[in-house]
Amino acid sequence: MWCWPGVRTAREAVALADGGAESPGESLTRLLLVELGLGPVDTQFPVSVGGRVYWADLRVGCHLVEFDGRVKVRSVGDGGVASRPAEDVLWEERRRQTAICGEGLGMSRVEWADLFGSRREATGRRILAEHAVTRERFGDRLPEHLAERAALVRRTTPRRRSA
């Protein structure tokens, strides 16, 4: 296969593939994290808080990165997935972030516009700065209780996303 045109690119693509991504936006965000030298990147990381399980898109150490697309706040009738008013979806998202970050995790948020053009470089710098703050506050290593809970959730809970 070494002489097939494009085989080197195909091998790189396969090496970067991750079945945990739930959207192209998550895949592009994960690729940005890899390009920034952050890693390893864990996809769909479960955080169990107060009897609820919240699934974070991406995790590097104690830092989470969430990709935010508008589809989660747009109604089903308008091509989205939200079955509740946008105000309720956004309010729940805020409560979710507060609960997750209360467990000793930092978080960055990324949207489509952050992944292209001049904003991509600025987003990379912002994520590196936010990740550095998380490392300073919480260290590099995921606390054992979070790692243990995540392992248990992954073994016993079917993967489920809510809008």
Locations of regions flagged by a protein language model:
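Surface segments flanking catalytic/ligand-binding clefts of nucleic-acid enzymes
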Residues: 1-163
